[in-house]
Amino acid sequence: MNTAPDPIVIIGAGMAGLACATWLHRAGRPVLVLEAADAVGGRVRTDITPDGFRLDRGFQILLTNYPEARRMFDYGALNLRSYRSGALVRLADGEETTLENPLHAPSMAFAALASPIGTLKDKLLIGKLVAQLAGRPPEQLLAQPSVTTLAYLRNFGWSEQIIDSFFRPFFGGVYLDRELNTASNFFEFVFQQFMQSAVMVPALGMQQLPEQLANRLPAGSVRLNTPVVAVADGGRTVHLANGETLAAAAVVLATDGSATAHLLGASQPAALPLAARLTTCTYFATVGRAPSHGRRLLHLNARPGALVHNVSFSSEVSAAVAPTGQSLVSVSTHGEHGLSEEELTARLRTELVDWFGPMAAMWRHLRTYRIEEALPAYTPGHPMQQELRLSDTLFQCGDWVSYPSLNAALGTGRQVAELITKEVTS
């Protein structure tokens, strides 16, 4: 009597786990993805309110030049919507200025030179860095020795004025680290990607990314609402919270660092642990058109001490995230603020009124997301990638074992799938 081979069991249906499952399925290996939550996506989730707003769990974007994303996604099927490549920056004195990416909008190059952000030398240095990074493979950038981003910027010759008015609000938002303690090799990677990529979101929200991957897998190969309590026998046995025991050809831990540690019965992750960055995303609804006037730019706040770090008028990028006649506003606050949801909302309103005028006082609070482990920290000296293989039949993947990026989550998932395909028999 023929019996089906034991599947590769992947714990976690976030981006890394789904990427791993997709590549294994393409290689003809049976897979079973176990997810504790009620939907796929991990941190990449979109909630729909009763009145029809689509709220991503935290402000998120897709950089279309990510090598792993280009391998993984069918962009045409995602109905992508684009931000303009640049930002509107509110300076310390309250004035606003618009920065355009000159590689995406060459006609704006002279306007960029006239911007009050930075000196002429600062702007020429940006051109110098663009030229230095052009054509270099991302893995080469990430493999370099590193210092903090702040030290790198100063060593490169940029003034404190452009550091405070551009690099802190922009890259501090990317890293969730306004102090710019993140490693400089990751800065070069991110800088290169922003210069070369379109900045996009799926029209119906970021959860369309994991759903596209999950929909490629065979029916029944993703089990939701299925928490795992332990992994045993070096990755050959999986114990579920409902008492069920599953046999596996191998196990892939595609969970965050703390969940991985728990499943391994350890106080810390098996690989070098990373601290996590905290962010809070607060959503507001406004009747009629938002005050951004269709510019589709991310609004950055360079004012020291502000709780509002960046603002996105999300429905100007994709009208589908808000019901007809209303607009959706996303407000991000990074780091620990020590405020209750009510206190935070009130403080944000005060700052938003100061920025956008009295109409902001009328914006209706929809929901607040406090995301404790939004991104792993990535500081100088940290290896570009930790061990993906823990034993002959036990593996781990995710951005926390590499660097804090969707590209890393997808890439480590692919690499684990390749290891299993070559070295693990069913």
Predicted regions and their residues:
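Mobile amphipathic helical/loop "lid" adjacent to a hydrophobic cofactor/ligand pocket
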Residues: 66-70, 79-180, 195
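N-terminal Rossmann-like FAD-binding beta1-loop-alpha1 element of flavoenzymes
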Residues: 6-33, 421
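Mid-domain catalytic core of redox enzymes
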Residues: 229-342, 346, 354-355, 385
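N-terminal glycine-rich dinucleotide-binding loop that anchors FAD/FMN and/or NAD(P) in oxidoreductases
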Residues: 47-71
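Short beta-strand to alpha-helix junction loop
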Residues: 60-67, 141-147, 156, 192-214, ...
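Conserved flavin/dinucleotide-binding core of flavoenzymes
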Residues: 314, 318-426
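Helical element adjacent to the flavin cofactor pocket in flavoenzyme catalytic cores
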Residues: 187-242, 246-250
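Glycine-rich FAD pyrophosphate-binding loop
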Residues: 25-50
